[in-house]
From Swiss-Prot:
Descriptive protein name: Radiation-inducible immediate-early gene IEX-1
Record gene name: Ier3
A single cellular component GO annotation: nucleus
Inducers of expression: By serum growth factors and TPA.
Sequence segments annotated as region (Disordered): 1-35
Organism the protein comes from: Mus musculus
Positions annotated with a glycan in the UniProt record: 137
Membrane-spanning residues: 86-102
Length: 160
């Protein structure tokens, strides 16, 4: 517990008065004798000194409160989560496969899958592959559309 200087002076002022008269304001008493005698002090003076001590004890002292400097708190470092990284990698692989997939092309079966799917009967006729559609023209219509576009561009060269 911290004591102020004023509190220490009041404690030294409670000592018995010295035979030599003092002129200091903290040791001088207004109601007591200046010279030490064995005579008891009057009752009124004892009560007033008791009140004086209690009033000084309850007096508010100004305290200087020191707060720490305002420092930005650092958040604890987050541990890397392996499951999140693996999930992100899986999504990236699936996204790349979907992006690079060719539409309309059937994927051939692996040799292990082909042997298990084939019946034990020998195949006499060769297997014909389905007709491959052109990637640019996936419709069953003829290429009249391309000719119409060429004719339009010849008639209207400034259109595009």
């Amino acid at each position: 517990m911290c004591h102020s200087r004023n509190h220490l002076h009041t404690m030294t002022g409670l000592r018995a008065p010295s035979p030599a008269p003092s002129t200091g304001p903290e040791l001088r008493r207004g109601s007591g004798p200046e010279i030490f005698t064995f005579d008891p002090l009057p009752e009124r003076a004892v009560v007033s000194t008791a009140r004086l001590n209690t009033s000084r004890g309850h007096r508010k002292r100004s305290r200087r409160v020191l707060y720490p400097r305002v420092v930005r708190r650092q958040l604890p470092t987050e541990e890397p989560n392996i499951a999140k990284r693996v999930l992100f990698l899986l999504f990236a692989i699936i996204f790349c496969q979907i992006l690079m997939a060719e539409e309309g092309v059937s994927q051939p079966l692996a040799p292990e899958d082909a042997t298990s799917a084939v019946t034990p009967e020998p195949i006499s006729a060769p297997i014909t592959a389905p007709p491959v559609l052109e990637p640019l023209n996936l419709t069953s219509e003829s290429s009249d559309y391309a000719l119409d576009l060429k004719a339009f561009l010849q008639q209207h060269p400034a259109a595009f």
